[in-house]
Curated annotation (Swiss-Prot):
Its EC number is 2.3.1.129. This is Acyl-[acyl-carrier-protein]--UDP-N-acetylglucosamine O-acyltransferase. The gene is lpxA. NCBIfam families: lipid_A_lpxA, PRK05289.1. Pfam families: Acetyltransf_11 (PF13720), Hexapep (PF00132). It comes from Ralstonia pickettii (strain 12J). It is found in: Cytoplasm. The lineage of its organism: Bacteria, Pseudomonadati, Pseudomonadota, Betaproteobacteria, Burkholderiales.
Length: 271
């Protein structure tokens, strides 16, 4: 099949766009002049890919998606900000992903092997890692960071500048306004949709090969942070002492990741 056969005749591809010869484009899709797409990427029908957008290899973009659109930020003044997407990502129908803003690094970034379901919104300047799952209608505001292997439940909403740590899980229909430490489950409580901590993501960690010792260590750190009468600073000190007393290197590694994340919080951690 030639490249002409892989691009539907009704698609509008700007002549300055850089597309690998193996890229497939569906009917009535529009691709702007500053777009680049790597080998094996497939785009459905009625999709718009615009802005300074780079898509890596073997990505799948669903129908009616909007990728690389202008940021929804009233300070935006047509600066040439970017969206950079890695390899092997699935971006389903009606998803909107915007470029960055000059007030941040100017880049919205998405890593590799992410599963982004229908009607997801990823706003300007977000940084999404690898192997994440965004369930349908998950919405993240500007400047949000999502770590590797994190899962966002359907219809969840995340406030701007919030961080979601690696291997964390956010429950469906939850409103998140503070950081979720790595390895932690956060979900809405009874009587409202504001997210609250609900323990370590034990099942997810087991599926990904974490050891019993690592999980036990994380549970102990979680109890110090959330289930004790310690202040935040006291809990951090106790977790640091726990790390110092841990001989197992893999356990020490995950505990250090947990401790470093909570120490770096600016919005506070979910409570």
């Amino acid at each position: 099949m030639t490249q002409a056969q892989k691009i539907h005749p009704t698609a509008q591809i700007d002549p300055n766009a850089e597309l690998d010869s193996s890229v497939e484009i569906g009917a009535f899709t529009v691709v702007g002049p500053n777009v680049r797409m790597g080998a094996g990427t497939r785009v459905g029908h009625h999709t718009v890919i615009e802005g300074y957008t780079t898509l890596g290899r073997d990505n799948s973009i669903g129908h009616f998606a909007s990728v690389g659109g202008r940021p929804q930020d009233m300070k935006y003044r047509d600066e040439p900000t970017q969206l950079i997407v890695g390899d092997r990502n699935t971006i389903r129908e009606f998803t909107a992903i915007h470029t960055g803003t000059a007030q941040d690094a100017g880049i919205t970034s998405i890593g590799d092997d992410n599963w982004i379901m229908a009607y997801v919104h990823i706003a300007h300047d977000c940084r999404v890692g690898n192997h994440t799952v965004f369930s349908s209608n998950a919405q993240i505001a500007g400047h949000v960071e999502v770590g590797d292997w994190a899962i966002l439940g359907g219809m969840s909403g995340v406030h701007q500048f919030v961080r979601i740590g690696a291997h964390a899980m956010l429950g469906g229909a939850s409103a998140l306004v503070q950081d979720v430490p790595p390895f932690v489950i956060a979900a809405s409580d009874k009587g409202g949709n504001k997210a609250a901590p609900h323990g370590i993501n034990v099942e997810g960690l087991r599926r990904r090969g974490f050891t019993a010792e690592q999980i036990t260590g994380l549970r102990q750190a979680y109890k110090l942070l959330y289930k004790s009468d310690l202040s935040f600073d006291q809990a951090k000190a106790e977790i640091a002492a726990q790390i110092a007393q841990t001989d197992d290197a893999p356990t020490r590694e995950v505990l250090t990741a947990f401790a470093d994340f909570i120490a770096a919080t600016k919005r506070g951690i979910v409570r």
